[in-house]
Design a protein with these regions (language model features):
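Membrane-interface helix termini and inter-helical loops of multi-pass transporters
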Residues: 30-40, 69-73, 101-104, 204
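Juxtamembrane helix-capping/reentrant segments at transmembrane boundaries
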Residues: 9, 71-87
Length: 204
């Protein structure tokens, strides 16, 4: 894998994209199971998620960079990660509140509770160690796909294979860019998997 491809993969599967990807996945394979079959409603959901979890946080990060609160938008250092992680967690909780207030979106709102838990977990770890949030988010996504496939009896197995292949590519890309050590990548993935597994287990 070349450096440019590793950079592209890292941007394409940046953790900030993950809530939007999860919503697209729900729209594609699980709409009827969540009693939301209207495409216009799904477009509203995607718009809210895009604004709350991607657009506004990115603009705030850019402002922090301009104000020299953080040194880099890549959040390479542990110091740079504190405020962005806290902001992301708050916006995830805000998105949860918006969706949870509408009855048919209650199931969807759990995604953002889980996302907030993961972010604050990463924030706590960041005080003493730099963990790969790319790997953590891919571990969370892998477990979520397995959960959906098992609980909602999804016949297609390709999403399961695909997410594990993508997880491997993302992890390798982070190592290729020397953004993390192998232990930071592996433990990030394991922690993402464990947190989501425990969360889903409490729902059963």
């Amino acid at each position: 894998m070349g450096k440019q491809l590793a950079i592209f993969i890292s941007y394409l599967f940046h953790p900030l994209w993950m809530p939007l990807y999860v919503m697209l996945m729900f729209w594609n394979i699980n709409a009827k199971a969540m009693f939301i079959s209207n495409d216009v409603v799904w477009l509203y959901i995607l718009l809210v998620v895009f604004i709350n979890t991607l657009l506004i946080p990115v603009l705030l990060f850019w402002m922090m960079k301009r104000l020299k609160i953080i040194e880099s938008l890549h959040l390479d250092s542990q110091k740079d990660r504190f405020y962005p992680f806290a902001i992301i967690g708050i916006f995830y909780l805000t998105t949860w509140y918006v969706f949870n207030s509408i009855e048919i979106f209650t199931y969807l709102s759990l995604v953002f509770v889980l996302a907030a838990i993961l972010v604050f977990f990463a924030l706590a770890i960041n005080f003493f160690w730099k963990i790969s949030i790319h790997s953590m988010s891919m571990g969370a996504m892998s477990t979520a796909v397995l959960y959906l496939a098992a609980v909602h009896f999804i016949d297609e197995v390709w999403p399961v294979y695909l997410i594990f292949i993508l997880s491997g590519l993302v992890g390798y890309a982070r190592l290729k860019l020397k953004a993390h050590s192998s232990s930071q990548v592996y433990i990030g993935y394991i922690l993402g998997t464990l947190v989501v597994s425990i969360f889903f287990f409490t729902l059963l």
